[in-house]
Design a protein with these regions (language model features):
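Catalytic-core regions of core metabolic enzymes
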Residues: 1-207
């Protein structure tokens, strides 16, 4: 079939040519198959919106690890899962489903709802906006320090704002190095959520 004159395919295999980016919005049971289909057929980056993996227990964590393994085996990187998408004002790209005010702030947020709140406040109270946004969720593959490195070298981003609930195991030193290096180039603001016991429980869903 078609949508607005553009062809639709049931899979990347059916499409017949690779894509730079895939948005993966399927139920949890179909997620691994979707990642495999994309990775095997040359997709460079997948944005996994689907939740219910590492934040939901051992079985979810196992599936999450397998998705990352399959993706990386074929040279594909994965944003998320359990994420709210990405936004790039310079590229004219908005994969969040929300209207984001443009400006020169790079926002890296583990929580989608916190990201939405910051967009609203920036537009309505500070009269500013964003150059880049990523809601990175579980950071199963691409960790927060990698987003920081990108934004640190991005001439369109004058300030980096990070909302962080937790780091991927083993990535603490990388985070410190990246944040410290970025702070030598531009202001870096970090808001740490999930400090209390109740906050940690709420933060585990990244919503």
């Amino acid at each position: 079939g078609e949508v607005d004159g553009r062809p639709m395919y049931k899979s990347m295999a059916e499409a017949g040519e690779p894509a730079d980016l895939a948005l993966i919005l399927v139920n949890k049971k179909a997620a691994l198959a979707a990642v495999t289909d994309c990775a095997v057929h040359g997709v460079k980056v997948g944005v996994m919106y689907t939740a219910g993996f590492g934040e939901m227990g051992e079985e979810g964590a196992r599936i999450q690890q397998e998705m990352v393994r399959v993706a990386n085996e074929h040279g594909m990187r994965l944003v998320g899962p359990n994420c709210m998408g990405v936004f790039s004002h310079p590229a004219g790209l908005n994969l969040t489903g929300e209207e984001i005010p443009s400006g020169d702030i790079a926002l890296i947020s583990q929580s989608g709802n916190i990201g939405f709140s910051l967009w609203y406040d920036a537009a309505n109270y500070l009269h500013t906006g964003f150059s880049r946004f990523v809601g990175f969720g579980n950071q199963a593959d691409i960790a927060v320090h990698e987003y920081i490195d990108y934004c640190a070298d991005d001439p369109m981003s004058k300030v980096i704002v990070i909302y962080l609930e937790g780091l991927r195991p083993g990535s603490g030193l990388d985070f410190i190095r990246s944040a410290s290096a970025a702070a030598k180039k531009k202001p870096v603001v970090i808001l740490k959520g999930g400090r209390s016991t109740a906050g940690k429980r709420a933060a585990s869903s990244h919503t």
